[in-house]
Regions:
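All-beta strand scaffolds that present successive hydrophobic residues in beta-strands
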Residues: 14-17, 39, 43-47, 58, ...
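Right-handed parallel beta-helix/beta-solenoid
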Residues: 38-42, 78-83, 108-118, 138-147, ...
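Short glycine/acidic-rich loop motifs that flank beta-strands on beta-rich extracellular proteins
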Residues: 25-27, 53-61, 73-74, 92-105, ...
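Extracellular beta-strand-rich solenoid/capping regions of secreted or surface-exposed proteins
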Residues: 2-14, 24-85, 111-114
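Acidic glycine-/aspartate-rich tracts in secreted/extracellular proteins
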Residues: 19-22
Length: 236
């Protein structure tokens, strides 16, 4: 496998657009990365267009696909036990509507055990714009079992409308807390590969329709929050 090594960010830093243009403008300040990103410290991306370009594996996908096949999960930001903040970030790759689903993944773990895992992964997705979207969010790791708590504060869209509170194929042991804002579109939580409590808070003035609360240990509604439960869902 010749996957690119991740871009390692090893100091507390804010990477922010400085032109004053909106992240959704065609000529917005932007960062294009053709590799995963891994945190080694607390990092904020703010007022910027962040394009994580999916890796193309040459020869994959059969003879008919001579250009190869995409490996979309290569476009992942790994929090690695640090605080990741995405503040008013446009995640769209390119300008073609066919690329609308080419969005970054987020993991609370590390890239193939690279770097050092911190004590707690905190993922903040705040002040969304119309192009603040993510392919999927995994609290856990892709390649290793982890013992770590994870906090996810989500106020944006996720393409599959769910949060994975474990790893992709490995176990996460630890508590996961999730806060859903009024711009989030989460309907369920997948606790596969997760051992620990799942506590969910719906932010004030937020409305959640058809929420499946199966697997949730504690559900909190802030002021003026409203939730309509999916039929048959059951709070533990």
């Amino acid at each position: 496998e010749k996957a690119p090594l991740p871009l390692m960010i090893n100091k507390n830093i804010t990477i922010e657009g400085s032109s004053g243009k909106l992240p959704t403008d065609v000529d917005a300040d932007g960062l294009v990365v053709r590799a995963p990103i891994q945190l080694g410290a607390n990092v904020t991306f703010k007022n910027i267009k962040l394009q994580l370009v999916p890796q193309v594996v040459l020869g994959a996908g059969g003879r008919q696909n001579i250009l190869g096949a995409q490996s979309p999960m290569a476009a992942t930001i790994f929090a690695a036990g640090n605080t990741l903040t995405l503040d008013n970030v446009n995640t769209k790759v390119g300008t073609n509507s066919l690329q609308d689903k080419d969005r970054p993944y987020i993991s609370g773990g590390t890239y193939k055990n690279n770097g050092t895992l911190g004590k707690k992964s905190i993922i903040n997705i705040i002040n969304p714009n119309s192009q603040t979207k993510f392919a999927a969010i995994y609290a856990g790791d892709y390649w290793n079992d982890r013992n770590i708590d994870v906090e996810i504060n989500l106020n944006s869209s996720v393409l599959n409308n769910k949060i994975y509170t474990g790893g992709f194929s490995k176990k996460l042991t630890g508590n996961v807390s999730v806060r859903l804002g009024d711009k989030s579109n989460i309907y369920s939580f997948d606790k596969t590969n997760h051992s620990g409590n799942l506590n969910v808070t719906v932010d004030k003035d937020s409305y959640m329709d058809n929420l499946d609360i199966n697997g949730i240990d504690e559900l909190t509604l802030d002021e003026n929050a409203k939730v309509i439960l999916k039929k048959g869902s059951d709070l533990n």
